[in-house]
Swiss-Prot record:
Subcellular location as annotated: Cell membrane
A cellular component annotation (GO) from this entry: plasma membrane
Reaction equation(s) it catalyzes: ATP + H2O + 4 H(+)(in) = ADP + phosphate + 5 H(+)(out)
Record has Cytoplasm as a keyword: no
Family designation: Belongs to the ATPase alpha/beta chains family.
Organism: Mycoplasmopsis agalactiae (strain NCTC 10123 / CIP 59.7 / PG2)
UniProt-recorded name of the protein: ATP synthase subunit alpha
Role of this protein: Produces ATP from ADP in the presence of a proton gradient across the membrane. The alpha chain is a regulatory subunit.
Gene3D superfamilies: 2.40.30.20, ATP synthase alpha/beta chain, C-terminal domain, P-loop containing nucleotide triphosphate hydrolases
Membrane topology, from the record: Peripheral membrane protein
The protein's Enzyme Commission number: 7.1.2.2
């Protein structure tokens, strides 16, 4: 009997000696009600706003409302797998996404998980998605152009690196096309691009991704998708996730371009979220902090000084209007936050003026400081010429007799509009744009019929990008601090006159009396 008790005590002592249990302390609550991607959770008394919580089946949520008895949680994942009384655990972490070069060429969802079937993202870095925007003293002046490759924008509504330029217009007026063309034009320009699709159809996003792949743009682009089929919480955080990824590259001294397509659907997602969380509605049922929703996002786009990395984030948010009404709540909010807007009109789009940019309503508040000197020189009078044309056209509709100067303004303006037409996925480099517009400024295009202006444009692009003489002229412009001097101007105009004469010579039914004459100083240049 004694030996048995000795054995038992030895076993107990041995177990006590080997006992190494760590106390697992975690705060656990339970779901009181759940629906529409929102769960009210009881028992998480110390939860913080913006904290990540975990449910079963590896589903996570974001704490958005802190009330006396419960916390409101937005669910990321399949909310149908959760039900009342399911447990919920605090993590003590805030929401973050993977960042770094590993995301280049990938398609991810709003929380940073890959959805392109190319395997996991092996990123070691993560970054919080809700951050404070850079302060005033950390920013520097926007003075470097971000080329869109679209002649109407680069000449009259220039965008600089670090700028926020709104693209606004009715549905189906080519807003996304402008943004995608801008991404494609960043090839070989050392700019990282991020395209955030908010509330878009999955088929539309698939088409855009394929186009980016076909044009080689996915080599420097990340696509973030929060589709129309996803719940409001994912659509709400998608643009912030994109900005966090861009901020990592900005801190490394890189230039980034981010497209938010579109912030109208983002505001609707936030309105849905707020109403489900029982927050008081305001104008158009949006919550009172909907202005802050977009200002905190867009203020993170900046050009920072070298102490903060020396990089930049250029933001192109897109807003969809109803019947061209830019005085609605969300459009006016975003217009007041951004540094200018590109306004697309439905009537221009249907009349064949594409991109359908309304030059009169569009503006860039950064202006010519975001242009190279050569472009500034050739495009300085362009907006005025088009304004005069639009004014004269209104008078011409009455059918009264017009004097010669009015006819000249009308003919010239019509030709300028023809030159501003540009096919989708057809970016034009800035030096070629400069040469094309020099022909407009110097009235070299006067003898050309309007139907031949696209041919003129293509010939100038070919000369400036493919022919040795044109490439040498481009190098001279770069060596001359991106400016034109009299000798460079003379070289370009000589070739422009030859191109115009060559086109005219190939036309069998050309009527010189129907067109304006070329300025006298260029008539002495020999025909080709």
């Amino acid at each position: 009997m004694a030996s048995k008790s000795t054995d038992i005590s030895a076993i107990i002592k041995d177990r006590i000696r080997r006992f190494d249990s760590k106390i697992d302390y975690s705060e656990i609550g339970y779901i009181v009600t759940i629906g529409d991607g929102i769960a009210l959770v009881n028992g998480l008394d110390n939860a913080k706003n913006g904290e990540i919580v975990k449910f079963k089946n590896n589903i996570t949520g974001l704490v958005l409302n802190l009330e006396e008895e419960v916390v409101g949680v937005a669910i990321f994942g399949d909310a149908n797998m959760l039900s009342e009384a399911d447990l919920c655990t605090r993590t003590g972490e805030v929401i973050a996404v993977p960042v770094g070069d590993e995301l280049t060429g990938r398609v991810i969802n709003a929380i940073g998980n890959p959805i392109d079937g190319k395997g996991p993202i092996n990123s070691t870095k993560r970054r919080e998605i809700f951050k404070v925007a850079p302060g005033v003293m950390s920013r520097v002046e926007v003075n470097e152009p971000l080329e869109t490759g679209i002649i109407a924008i680069d000449s009259m509504i220039p965008i600089g690196k670090g700028q926020r330029e709104l693209i606004i217009g009715d549905r189906q007026t080519g807003k996304t096309s402008i943004a995608i063309d801008t991404i494609i034009n960043q090839k070989d320009k050392n700019v990282k691009c991020i395209y955030v699709a908010i509330g878009q159809k999955n088929s539309t996003v698939a088409q855009i991704t394929k186009k980016l792949q076909d044009s080689g743009a996915m080599e420097y682009t990340t696509v973030i998708v929060s589709g129309a089929s996803e719940l409001a919480p994912q659509q709400y955080i998608a643009p912030y996730s994109g900005t966090a990824i861009a901020e990592e590259w900005m801190s490394e001294g890189k230039d980034c371009l981010i497209i938010y397509d579109d912030l109208s659907k983002h505001a609707i997602a936030y309105r849905t979220l707020s109403l489900l969380l029982r927050r008081p509605p305001g104008r158009e049922a949006y919550p009172g902090d909907v202005f802050y929703l977009h200002s905190q996002l867009l203020e993170r786009a900046a050009k920072v000084n070298y102490s903060y990395g020396g990089g930049s984030i250029t933001a192109l948010p897109i807003i969809e209007t109803q019947q061209g009404d830019i005085s609605a709540y969300i459009p006016t909010n975003v217009i007041s936050i951004t540094d200018g807007q590109i306004f697309t009109r439905e009537n221009l789009f249907h009349s064949g003026q594409r991109p359908a940019v309304d030059v009169g309503f569009s503006v860039s508040r950064v202006g010519s400081s975001a242009q190279i000197k050569a472009m500034k020189e050739v495009s300085s009078s362009l907006k005025l010429e088009l304004a005069q044309y639009n004014e004269m056209q209104a008078f011409a509709q009455f059918g009264s007799d017009l004097d010669d100067s009015t006819i000249a303004i009308l003919k010239h303006g019509h030709k300028v509009y023809e030159l501003l037409k540009q096919e989708q996925y057809y970016p034009i480099n800035q030096l070629a744009q400069t040469a094309i517009l020099l022909g407009v400024k110097e009235k070299i295009i006067n003898p050309l019929p309007a139907s031949q202006l696209r041919r003129y444009r293509d010939e100038v692009i070919k000369f400036m990008t493919k022919e040795l003489e044109g490439i040498k002229i481009g190098e001279k412009i770069k060596q001359n601090n991106n400016a034109l001097n009299s000798s460079i101007k003379e070289e370009i105009t000589t070739h422009l006159v030859k191109i115009v004469n060559k086109i005219i010579a190939s036309l069998h039914d050309y009527k010189p009396e129907a067109e304006l004459p070329m300025p006298a100083k260029y008539l002495e240049i020999n025909n080709v």
